[in-house]
Amino acid sequence: MKELLYYTFIETEVTGAFLVFREKTQNLVFASLGNDKLFLLGKVEGFLKKHEKQDTMYDLQELKEAETYKKSIENYTICLENKMPLPSGAIPFEFLFGTDFQRKVWNELLNVEHGHVATYGDIAKRIGKPTAARSVGRACGSNNLALLVPCHRIVGSNRKLTGYKWSCKLKEQLLNNEKENSLSLSRL
């Protein structure tokens, strides 16, 4: 069985984003950050090939008619530019990939609010695995829904920035933008 996935690339002042939608559900299933569209396309193609299931092959096509996905794309751009925290459900997404443990971690990351951070150890405790901070870190590194599953809000036990799949510099910029945005919103 072939499953159709559509991709598009957006550019913002912060960075670019490569977005992949599942045609069957119209949900976002992959969001990767960076400015090199061809590099990101190659990464996604390699990832999909690696994760093809016995009975499912993925057909990745460029999104030509964006009307169905227009609102999600607009909201992701807002999210990337950190103009405001988006309400839950503003961008429908789903975990098409990932182990049960990874999905448990990713679901817990959804509870780390805009403008706040948590440690890998905090997340490990919240999912009932208090000694699994390193495994939580690996799950964060496997997150393929950048920003929506906010792994950029997770820091080391010393509260310092640690690795980020898309660069520590970008992680710092995203956190600073969220912090500024949260302060601006609290003044209203």
From Swiss-Prot:
What broad class of enzyme is this?
transferase
The name under which this protein is listed is: Methylated-DNA--protein-cysteine methyltransferase
Q: What EC number(s) are associated with this protein in UniProt?
A: 2.1.1.63
GO molecular function terms listed in the Swiss-Prot or TrEMBL record: DNA binding; methylated-DNA-[protein]-cysteine S-methyltransferase activity
Concerning what turns on (or off) its expression, the entry says:
In contrast to some bacterial and mammalian enzymes, MGT1 is not induced by alkylating agents.
> Does the keyword Cell inner membrane belong to this entry?
no
Spell out the note in the miscellaneous section.
This enzyme catalyzes only one turnover and therefore is not strictly catalytic. According to one definition, an enzyme is a biocatalyst that acts repeatedly and over many reaction cycles.
Any single GO CC term annotated in Swiss-Prot or TrEMBL for this entry: nucleus
The primary location reported for this protein is nucleus
Name the PANTHER family on file. METHYLATED-DNA--PROTEIN-CYSTEINE METHYLTRANSFERASE (PTHR10815:SF13)
Q: Which InterPro entries match?
A: MethylDNA_cys_MeTrfase_AS, MethylDNA_cys_MeTrfase_DNA-bd, MethylDNA_cys_MeTrfase_DNAb, WH-like_DNA-bd_sf
Q: Which residues bind DNA?
A: Y120, G121, R134, S157
Q: What biological function has been recorded for the protein in this entry?
A: Involved in the cellular defense against the biological effects of O6-methylguanine (O6-MeG) and O4-methylthymine (O4-MeT) in DNA. Repairs the methylated nucleobase in DNA by stoichiometrically transferring the methyl group to a cysteine residue in the enzyme. This is a suicide reaction: the enzyme is irreversibly inactivated. Prefers double-stranded DNA over single-stranded DNA as substrate.
Query: What UniProt keywords apply to this chain's record, in alphabetical order?
Result: DNA damage, DNA repair, DNA-binding, Methyltransferase, Nucleus, Transferase
As for family, the record states: Belongs to the MGMT family.
> Where is this gene product found?
Nucleus
From the UniProt record, list the reaction(s) this protein catalyses. Answer: a 6-O-methyl-2'-deoxyguanosine in DNA + L-cysteinyl-[protein] = S-methyl-L-cysteinyl-[protein] + a 2'-deoxyguanosine in DNA; a 4-O-methyl-thymidine in DNA + L-cysteinyl-[protein] = a thymidine in DNA + S-methyl-L-cysteinyl-[protein]
Gene that specifies this protein: MGT1
